[in-house]
From Swiss-Prot:
The lineage of its organism: Eukaryota, Metazoa, Chordata, Craniata, Vertebrata. Keywords: G-protein coupled receptor, Glycoprotein, Membrane, Receptor, Sensory transduction, Taste, Transducer, Transmembrane, Transmembrane helix. This is Taste receptor type 2 member 3. It is found in: Membrane. Residues 1-5, 63-93, 149-185, 255-265 are extracellular. It holds the Pfam family TAS2R.
Amino acid sequence: MGLTEGLFLILSGTQFALGILVNCFIGLVNGSSWFKTKRMSLSDFIITTLAFLRIILLCIILTDSFLIEFSPNAHDSGVIMQIIDVSWTFTNHLSIWLATCLGVLYCLKIASFSHPTFLWLKWRVSRVMVWMLLGVLLLSCGSTASLINEFKLYSVFRGIEATXNVTEHFRKKRSEYYLIHVLGTLWYLPPLIVSLAAYFLLIFSLGRHTRQMLQNGTSSRDPSTEAHKRAIRIILSSFFLFLLYFLAFLIASFGNFLPKTKMAKMIGEVMTMFYPAGHSFILILGNSKLKQTFVEMLRCESGHLKPGSKGPIFS
């Protein structure tokens, strides 16, 4: 094992550990809160489910990383490869859609518009979000099922490539795989468009609200303005992290067709681990309960706050 492979394993292991810690923290805080009150808000439910899915996703990515390094032949074998691909695709698509649902929830709760359609959705936000969650679950199942043929084709041509028996039939199969793979990436467009729509609606709503505050001679740092800004920061950060994750996913998936296949795969795998951990950390900073618990925990560790005591968390 060379320097590059060792660095790859260290980075993968570090990001995996950080991602597991961050997402387990979310699950424990929200889980203990639910256990005490027997109630959980819709946003907490989405964030907790997202954390659970990301723990699974990180485990899948780490398994894939170790197989690439220590057992490339097993990694490219039909059954193992298809199991990893199906598991990765489902958890990946569902977690991306859940992050999108969270942005939509923030938009409906915080933004203010007088359009009848928006008001109808805002007044029925809980019912709308429940149906949306069911919809994205079915959509994730459908997108995964639609890509099963792609996974089978990949296993076929990797097997043929290993025998070095490159025929015209093989070239046709590989071209077919390219086409299906490119079309498969289009499944990422809908959540991206919905997230952008929620972001711009919040921007427009913030602009209108700020103008109203200025006209009334009121301070622009009112609770509604701060809520707008916090939601915009979360959605915008999520958007840029998602773009980075999408780029990493493309590098990892198209790595088989690049000159340095193994190197491209390793770079892609390391980059993909950043999103499940980074976005969850952003959610902690954007959620008052999670942020307060996180800051209290840090103060306890540094000896500035005794466990169970209340400190001035926010200025």
